[in-house]
């Protein structure tokens, strides 16, 4: 085997791109990408949270989180305000139109999830999620 074919990182990135493209195509009618859907879904669950907290929940750095929020803010799906307790911190909340977009996208996401599990088998999909959740990197 060639080193490239043995590289865990490259194999994971290739699979990630294929899966992301699949979910993006299923969510396309809503105008959302799966990364944006994840943000809206998390805000729907958590309510208003700081940018830093949202970034931690999604395992993203603050700069990337900001870049991901900008289109959602332009679409008026999220509202960014200064924190009432710390003027340096920004709080992100889901707007009414963001909630409606989340509801529409959730239907399509559930279909994509079912299609993915049908194609790969429910046990394989569950094992994949479990493996990825418990994956250790380094020591």
Residue spans for each PLM region:
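N-terminal leader segment of winged-helix/HTH proteins
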Residues: 1-30, 123-126, 130, 134-135
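Charged, amphipathic alpha-helical coiled-coil/dimerization segments
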Residues: 20, 48, 70-130
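Short alpha-helical "packing" element that flanks the helix-turn-helix/winged-helix DNA-binding module
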Residues: 36-40
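Helix-turn-helix DNA-binding elements, focusing on the entry/boundary residues of the two helices
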Residues: 51
